[in-house]
C-alpha cells in the first residue's frame, strides 16, 4: 500500500490556558480536602456513622476557606489619647480602650449571641475509601515472613508490554509519536506528522504470579460486664479499622473473632461487632482458645500469626499470673502480640500491672483514654518496620 493510501492520524493542540483557572481551583480544593482529612483523621476514625456503616457511606468534614482581605470602616479613627497635663506619675493610667470599657466584639462561642463575623468554612463529603487511603498508607503487618511460597501465590496485573494493536484508551502516545518521527525522518522529513497505522503503539497488561505469605489475625475482645458501652465501642472501633486495613492491603489474611468473659468462644464477625454479653472476667480463657486455634488450624510453620486482645484491664487478680504465662507461650508461636486497654479514667489495672513486666520486643501494648487513641493504637501496632519489607 502506498503512503498516499495510508490512513493518517493527526495531533491536535488546544490553548489550555483558557481552562487553567478551573483546573487550579479544583487542585487547590483537593489539596485542602486532603489536608482536612489528615488533620481530622484521629477524630474521623471513631465517628459512629463510619464504624456502624456498610463501608460505602460518605462523611462530612469542615474545610476552612482561604483567608481573604476585607475592607472595613475604622470607627475609632477620631479617638486619640494624649500624654496628660504634666502631672503624670508612675502607675497612672494614660490610655484606655476606645470601646469605653465594653466587652470586645467577637464571634459567638458557647452560650449567648456574638456580634462579629465568624470564620467561614464548609463541609466536604469524603468517602470512606479516601479515609482508608490516608489512614492505611503507613501501616503494615510487623515482622511478616515468607511461608509456603510455592503453595500460596497471588495474581497481579502489570502493564509491561507494548503491541501494535489494542484499546484506544491504552495507546502509548509517546512511543507512537517517536515511531512516526523516526519513519518520517527516514523519508527525509523529520516531523511528527503524518502518523500512520504502523506507528501506533498500545500498552497492554500481563497477569503476573507473585509469591505471598499466609497470615492469620486473632481478634480477641473482652465482653464481660465490666466492659461498658464506651469501652466496647472503642474496642469495636479498633477492630473495625483493623479488619478493613487487613482486607485492603493483604489478599491472604484470615481473621478469627474470639469473644470472652469467664469463658471464650469463636464467634462470627457479625456477632463480634454487635452482640453484647455480661459476667465476670477471666482473660486466660481467651488465650487458651487462641492457642487451641493455632494448634488445630494455624501452624506457625505455615502462617504468620498476630493475636490482638482488647479489654478494660479488670481481670480476676488470681488469673493474672496465668495470663502472663499464656501470653509468653503465645509469643513463641506468633510474630507479634498486641494488647489494647480501654482505660478512660486512668484507674488501676490489674492486668496491665502484670503485663508491664513482660520484656519482649514482640509484645506491644497501648492504653486508650479517648476516641482519638484508636487512630494512635493502629499506628502503634501496625507501624512500618525500618528493616527490609517482604517482597
From Swiss-Prot:
Composition bias, Polar residues: 1-16
Region Disordered: start-end pairs: 1-31, 80-117
InterPro entries linked to this entry: Spore_YhbH, UPF0229
Pfam families: DUF444 (PF04285)
Entry similarity comment: Belongs to the UPF0229 family.
Species assigned in the record: Bacillus cereus (strain B4264)
Name of the protein: UPF0229 protein BCB4264_A0587
Biased composition (Gly residues): 98-115
Biased composition, class Basic and acidic residues, residue ranges: 21-31
Domain of life of the organism encoding this protein: Bacteria
NCBIfam families xrefs: spore_yhbH
